[in-house]
Amino acid sequence: MSKKYLWVLLILILPTFSLMLKNGIYTMHDFHIFRQQQFDKCLSQGYFPCRWAADAGLGYGEPVFNFYGQFPYWVGQIFRESGLQIIDSVKINFILTLVLSAVAMFFLARRFWGNLG
């Protein structure tokens, strides 16, 4: 019975990321794309772990990755290294985050409230 509800949940979440399936950038702030590009640039220059966003802060650079979690950018970098553009890797990262958070919330609610959740 849980598989049926899980599939219903996944079908209901499709409209959530329908704008992300179109070409180009959808309406959002572009700092995720900028940070993914800076993370890609930092790794391509041979820095590990990546800490410095060289083009941030009006070109002076900022230690963005010291203070902001790097995990989403590592996941996006997997898609980037597989040959996708930066915009597409950010979109896939967002879609993956939406789907995984919905599935995790489903199982968490099920654990607390049983079949009512």
Per-range role (PLM):
Residues P15-W113, G117:
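Active-site lumenal/periplasmic loops and adjacent helix-entry segments of GT-C-fold
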Residues M1-L19:
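Start-transfer (signal-anchor) and selected internal transmembrane alpha helices
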